[in-house]
């Protein structure tokens, strides 16, 4: 009886994770400088122009950013760090279950 309860709980936890993953997408990537070195601490903003909502993350020590659990829509990504030009990429379509890899190379200049 106890084993069947544990099995049922494990199934429900697994099913909820699968459902959550299958109703959203993800965007990730690496940000580097003109020399090809990765850049930590870069602010990456995901903007939904339809709802005017923004989610922001920062790159880690490997220059990697990950934005998980994104609802399907068309988004704009904005990348900013002091001393570099801001980069904006529009028209990024996130679909159910998609995993989009979008890398950026920063250019030295004003924000």
Ranges and model annotations:
Residues 2-7, 13-111:
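Periplasm-facing N-terminal accessory domains of Gram-negative outer-membrane beta-barrel systems
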């Amino acid at each position: 009886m106890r084993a069947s309860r544990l099995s049922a709980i494990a199934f429900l936890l697994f099913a909820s994770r699968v459902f959550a993953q299958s109703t959203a997408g993800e965007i990730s990537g690496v940000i580097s400088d003109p020399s090809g070195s990765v850049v930590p601490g870069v602010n990456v903003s995901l903007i939904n122009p339809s709802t005017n909502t923004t989610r922001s993350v920062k790159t880690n020590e490997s220059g990697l950013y990950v934005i998980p659990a994104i609802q399907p829509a068309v988004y704009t990504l904005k990348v900013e760090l002091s001393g570099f030009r801001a980069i904006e990429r529009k028209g990024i379509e996130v679909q159910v279950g998609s995993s989009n890899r979008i890398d950026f190379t920063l250019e030295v200049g004003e924000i």
